[in-house]
Amino acid sequence: MIKKRSILIVTRKSPLALWQAEFVKQQIENSHPHLACQILGCTTQGDRLTTEKLVDSGGKDLFVKDLQKALLNRDADIAVHSIKDMSACDGPELMVGAFIRREDPRDVLIVKGELSTLPPHAVIGTSSPRRQCQLKKFQPGCKIKEIRGNVGTRLAKLDAGHYEAIVLAAAGLKRLGLENRIHYYFDPHEFIPAIGQGAIGVECRSDDHEMQTLLKSLDHRETRLCVTAERAVNEKLGGDCFTPIAAHAIIKNDQLSLFAMLGKIDGRVIIRATEIGNSEEAQRIGFKVASQLLEQGGDSLLRELKQ
């Protein structure tokens, strides 16, 4: 019997991260029967920070850096990430070799009781500045309360009565078979999702040409183009996970429509921009939308946010 070559996949240990890694494993093994994948679970620095705010400790990159270190040390061949956890730009030594077909990118509201009985001054759980900003516009009287943990932990905190509602990504709930918990889907044109939300990225070393070729079979063109446009917005703005920035792209008949916003956490200022163009010019569209945001006062807003 010919021994199959083993591909080492590094990922976080949360149920959602393991689901995503298992999905990528199956995709690789189905497309390349001569390969066998092994999943390596990693507890990242972000996972270890159970009480501190991410904004005080380095941001979402803390969920990514340990996985990237495993790639650079050649302890793994590929790393599986939620794209929304990644920085706008890849370093020269690493690259996203495949963007897996995107799941539902929308944000959703999960309520402890019934949506119809949610009070105007409800305590809503989220740690995202982007969500806080848009929630204050959507429900001005609500009280925002920080929440940490994976999907299951956050749902348990809601069920225990610590919150009256929480905001999560539809994609994670659907992947974990928890779609029945969703009470309300936010319109992605009004309540704009996080950059890359719902998309999975498979990262590899830039010098590993064999792995790059292998990952091409997993790459979903439409997802790659949409995420490229969204990430270009943040690349030009220079935002981070502390900045209320959102961007969402869709493609129809090879035309890419990009919606973006930049605002203050309290929701009192929200700047919006939209652009439509050829999907092959995804990055240019993203840069143009970012320029529109800056021209509308985004430059001074960013300076204020970074003070």
UniProtKB/Swiss-Prot annotation:
An annotated GO BP? protoporphyrinogen IX biosynthetic process
Q: Which residues carry this modification: S-(dipyrrolylmethanemethyl)cysteine?
A: C241
Keyword Transferase belongs to the record: yes
- Which top EC class applies here? transferase
Q: What keywords is this UniProt entry annotated with?
A: Porphyrin biosynthesis, Transferase
Needed cofactors, names only, are: dipyrromethane
Record field: catalytic activity: 4 porphobilinogen + H2O = hydroxymethylbilane + 4 NH4(+)
- Identify the metabolic or biological route this protein is part of: Porphyrin-containing compound metabolism; protoporphyrin-IX biosynthesis; coproporphyrinogen-III from 5-aminolevulinate: step 2/4
Q: What superkingdom heads the lineage? A: Bacteria
Q: How is the cofactor bound?
A: Binds 1 dipyrromethane group covalently.
Molecular-function annotations in GO: hydroxymethylbilane synthase activity
Please provide one cellular component term from the Gene Ontology annotations of this protein.
cytoplasm
Q: What is its EC number?
A: 2.5.1.61
Q: InterPro entries annotated for this entry?
A: HemC, Porphobilin_deaminase_cofac_BS, Porphobilin_deaminase_N, Porphobilinogen_deaminase_C, Porphobilinogen_deaminase_C_sf
The question of whether Transferase is a record keyword is answered with yes
Q: What else is known?
A: The porphobilinogen subunits are added to the dipyrromethane group.
Role noted for this protein? Tetrapolymerization of the monopyrrole PBG into the hydroxymethylbilane pre-uroporphyrinogen in several discrete steps.
Q: Self-association or partners: how does it assemble? A: Monomer.
Task: Name the protein family.
Answer: Belongs to the HMBS family.
Record protein name field: Porphobilinogen deaminase
The taxonomic lineage of its organism, from the top, reads:
Bacteria, Pseudomonadati, Pseudomonadota, Gammaproteobacteria, Legionellales
The UniProt gene name for this protein comes to: hemC
